[in-house]
Amino acid sequence: MDSSLDGAAGDSSKCSEMSVDEKRQLVYELSKQSHLAAEVLQAWSRQEILQILCAEMGKERKYTGLTKVKIIETLLKIVSEKNSGECEGKKRDSDCLPIQRNTKRQRKVDNPSRYVIPATNIVTSNNASGSCSSVNTKGESTTIYCKNLACRAVLRQEDSFCRRCSCCICRKYDDNKDPSLWLTCSSDPPFEGESCGFSCHLECAFNTEKSGLGKDKQSEGCCFYCVSCGKANSLLECWKKQLTIAKETRRVEVLCYRLFLVQKLLKSSTKYRNLCEVVDEAVKTLEADVGPLTGLPMKMGRGIVNRLHSGPDVQKLCSSALESLETIATTPPDVAALPSPRSSKMQQDCSYVLSNEISADTATTGSTKIRFEDVNATSLTVVLASNEIPSPPNIVHYSIWHRKVPEKDYPEKSTCTLFIPNTRFVVSGLAPASEYCFKVVSYSGTREMGVDEINVLTRSAEEGANCSSAVERSVSPLTNCSTLSSNPSSVEAESNNDYIVPKKPSSKNEDNNSPSVDESAAKRMKRTTDSDIVQIEKDVEQIVLLDDEEQEAVLDKTESETPVVVTTKSLVGNRNSSDASLPITPFRSDEIKNRQARIEISMKDNCNNGDHSANGGTESGLEHCVKIIRQLECSGHIDKNFRQKFLTWYSLRATSQEIRVVKIFIDTFIDDPMALAEQLIDTFDDRVSIKRSAVGGSGASAVVPSGFCMKLWH
């Protein structure tokens, strides 16, 4: 044995200064003395022995399942077989290490699959850069490889570290790299674009201000900035990795360290406060058992998560946070465009019913649940956090801004501020056929909880006019008029806007023309039969009485004529009076009294409607009641039969006191539909079930209250 090699064999410090080829030569010499070889190699480090073993086999393996003694025996066996030439290389690779039989994934094409150190080259290493280079016997530098045995990537001359396996901040690599503790600059969405591909330790990123994850750094997004190129990259994947490991781990030290990392990552983001609250709760629960989290992997006596009192609860919170994070990753952008109000066929036809259900104008978005109702050409109603979807308990008030979509900035002053529970506001002064963007900011005290933006398109002026005319047609008066005089030629006229008042013939010409008038009147009489009146009573949405102005016009026009048109309201009279049991033939003085009574009733109705309008926006009292009853039927709290009877009674027979009681019930139980339905059924079931008798003859019918005839007129 050479003297220099003999001295190195006994001194481990000299051995560390030797090159790989010199170490291999020394091992070959030691293999000839089997009693001395094992003792000398035992003084060497495990990494030095593995380096020689990989060079001898031509393969890079970690041999984590073998002890140091077993590795030395394997190395000496391979060297002895090479010296004796007893077996071939292929057989040696397959037989010498039976434990390492697992197939490994192929490396990428742009990197060398295996690196074999040539016997004629001298390898020099550079510990600072983490790379090594091979120099041939002529002194010419050839190829530079990464010092990491698990990487061995080819490096360029200008590279100071391996971008594939080393940190771009500390320029070091991990022997057993954990990808969940590294951040990589990539082109993955939502931050697409050219990336450098460098990676760094997560701990190094926390200690560097350029990464945006410093102690005092806060950002609205969930990103970090590459220290090398400055590109923004998403942190969502890193969050999910930490939470997944924390949810599945069995070791307490791993759970503590991962939760510490998640909490540190979330503190740098102002956008995901809800997720941060869940993680903070998990950390507080865990700290009650293990103490404050220092951030470094720790060894604990009770190292199993299931042995901790709070272990299962903490991992459940991790699962909850992970589900919230998955929802965030799959949520579309915040700004969502509402469907245009013109797209609904119901709104194009403007076929509104008395219930005024505008489901097509309603849309929700975001956590605040913004809804638009009564979208017109110049105004609309904004509704936040409806009764079906109440607002979160920590929300105190909302501030609303609006602008046209082409405009970039919102006005400095907010459009309105809504405080819980009042979450409805009418916005007027809008331009027809214009798209507006509404921004709603929710607050908990002075703290901003969230921002939602939503677009809406107002109607055009033509659509607004068409809708107005359609609404007028839908509520056009359907008269039910009849005369109770002894004149047999008197007829009952019924139409939307016109009426027929036949006169007694005063001349021959009038006698000749009277049959044509009677024929036309007879045709119109066919429209109103007893069955029609019963059908009208069953479906209250298809019957509307004459309003006060039209009744005044009818009475003024018929004052000078013998037959008098009597409206349903004047026919029935005062609902509370027993004198209204029978129809009365009106005289001049009676008409004046009826006119005054109608004015008083109109004023009362306006007052009632005003009360409802205050609670229900632009809805009248009857419309508001019909809408509520219809909602109770759709939700299954009442049946169709009760709905028909109740609305017929409410619109035709209910007294002012009963209407007031119904209004109080609706306003009181509006948040509890089931209780409202039970109260209405219990209070008014008997009243709505009372049938009204129809009297009259020769095709003319009138609906009057049942009972004894107390007075008689002639």
Swiss-Prot record:
Chain segments carrying region VIN3-Interacting Domain (VID): 602-714
Cited CDD domains: FN3, PHD_VIN3_plant
Listed InterPro entries: FN3_dom, FN3_sf, Ig-like_fold, Oberon-like_PHD, VIN3-like, VIN3-like_C
One Gene Ontology cellular component: chromatin silencing complex
Region listing for Disordered, in residue ranges: 478-530
Record note on what altering C204A does: Abolished histone-binding
GO molecular function per UniProt: DNA binding; histone H3K9me2/3 reader activity; identical protein binding; methylated histone binding; zinc ion binding
Compositionally biased intervals (Polar residues): 478-498
Keyword terms of this UniProt record: DNA-binding, Flowering, Metal-binding, Nucleus, Repressor, Stress response, Transcription, Transcription regulation, Zinc, Zinc-finger
PANTHER family tied to this protein: VIN3-LIKE PROTEIN 2, VIN3-LIKE PROTEIN 2-RELATED
Protein name: VIN3-like protein 2
Gene: VIL2
